[in-house]
Amino acid sequence: MTLIYESAPELDETITIDPDIEDLHYDRTVDRHKVHRAAVSEVFLTDIRRQSAQHVLVAAQLPSSHSFFHDSIYNDAEGTPDALLLLEIARQATIASAHEVGVDAGNTLISNEFGLTIYPHEIAALNPEDTNLLIRNYFDWTSIRRGAPRSGRCYQQLIMGNRVIAEHFSGGRILTKNQLQALRSEYRGTPPPTTANLHELTFTDVQDPIAPERVGRRNPLNVVISQLNTTETPTAQVTPNVANKALFDHAYDHITMQILTEAARQLYLATRPDSELAPEISSIRGNFLAFAELDSPVQIRAIAAGEFVVEQDNRQIADFALKS
């Protein structure tokens, strides 16, 4: 199978950073609504500064501890930012920056694809005390209607200690609330349930749970797959615990891209022959073809080394590629 992912071009190096970035602050978080979060503790951005029409600088700070991102059995992970944490910071920066350049605050960004490349050698050169990040965000809109962006990509550089430690891009569409509701109902035929309606979900009673250490975790709450099968083609069911507020910060009507990405990482870890060693993930790519519904089983399946597809109701809804 050929993954849908296309290589992202590098950020335009002719873009200059305003000297005033020294004024970006790191002493308080931005309004949680700017990153679509309910809990302030889940907000990692601290400042936003628009540089030009489509270029935004964002300040962020790595959390000193976190129930999900810092839950790892690998000692080496303590000195390296978790890949999913960098993805979440990039996601928050994309949302906040999009609103900064003209996307209405009431609209929803629907992700179709993302790519994260991490540079471990740059991270290794950092001062262990470094926690402040600078994220350069540049938008390339592919559709604009009535002066408002409707679809496109955001390209990002994540910088710590004057070093680019990672690059990220994401692409997708922007929908109003009414457009999103119509899309969801048209696809399903009925309005989708939400995580607030626990009795309607299919993964509240997990069968054949996996030991946390099998997927690099300590806390069972952070295990998002179950019914692991490694005999031939490795497969697992995607069964996140809705009590995990780090994953379900508010009520959702689908399984999020963050959870599906973590499911891919956990299946990757569970099927590695040297799973006792801490993997240094250098890149993650993801594509999303449809929403992962809450009321029908979701399966993740390995199709090659480091490559996975997510399926629901006998159709592919996402794919991932991970590299160490």
What would you call each of these model-derived segments?
Residues 167-173, 315-324:
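Short amphipathic beta-strand/extended segments with alternating polar/hydrophobic composition
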Residues 1-78, 175-247, 324:
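Non-catalytic linker/capping segments at the edges of enzyme domains
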Residues 60-66, 105-116:
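A short glycine/small-residue-enriched secondary-structure motif
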Residues 219-289, 297:
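Acidic/His-leaning functional-site neighborhoods
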Residues 81-108, 255-276:
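Active-site helix/loop of acyl-thioester processing domains in fatty-acid/polyketide metabolism
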Residues 68-76, 99, 103, 123:
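Flexible, membrane-facing loop/turn or short amphipathic-helix motifs
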